[in-house]
Curated annotation (Swiss-Prot):
GO terms for cellular component: cytoplasm. This is Probable nicotinate-nucleotide pyrophosphorylase [carboxylating]. Pathway: Cofactor biosynthesis; NAD(+) biosynthesis; nicotinate D-ribonucleotide from quinolinate: step 1/1. Disulfide bonds: none annotated. The keyword Glycosyltransferase applies. Gene3D superfamilies: Aldolase class I, Quinolinate phosphoribosyl transferase, N-terminal domain.
Amino acid sequence: MMDIIREMIRADVGFEDITTEALIDRGTRVVADIVSREEGVVAGVEVAEMMAREFSISIIRWKDDGDPLSGGERVLTLEGDAMDILMVERTMLNLMMKMSGIATLTRSMLQRARAVNEGIRIAATRKTTPGLQWFEKQAVRIGGGDTHRFRLDDCAMIKDNHIAIVGNIEDAVRRVRDHVSFTKKVEVEVESPDDAVRAAEAGADIVLLDNMSPETIRNTLEELERRGLRDNVIVEASGGIKPDNIELYASTGVEVISMGFITASAHPVDLSLEIRGLK
């Protein structure tokens, strides 16, 4: 992760921070606070500590990842060379704000879903920002969600385009089973109740019901139950699930709801860095 963080800082600084170089002498030590300006769930504290260590900036934690935030609360106190603190300020805040926004939205969605389905999981998708996947998925985890796949090698997930090329679900599942380790689960994305049954009969571990209405999902689960297949698979719902309908989907009885919404549409939590004084 530090390679990614270093590159972010290099991209932000360019050749030098010309304003700070003009105004502040190297060796000027300051104390600064990172403060929240609104409510939320904090995430990115450990990332901030990684950045601070890289530049010999000491940190006092007032909040840990996953803690609730109110407006005006201190999250971290930094002490170090003013030039270093000002150099990393924007990158540190950007990551913390983005991660905190995702954690906040994830926790909200999880609470809504579990109000009607106590054991349900809320999972991310791979609809993440290139280069920021790890940070965004970690934020989902901090908010209480499931990371789902980090990468393509985490789980064999047979999607509609795979099936379109191979020709049918049964052959796709068989060929994946023959190719991957027994330690990897096989998930099949389907768009109809009939295909959900076919995927379960073919031996899928997870069946993803994509872009189905809550009513169709209920009918699909009933059909799997009627055929004695329901206990053989984890059923996941995805596609078009947002804050205004998550309870409807959770109440169907699926084990997992996966949402691109929690990483793609989260509003960053407003944080600021304030220099408290010279040290």
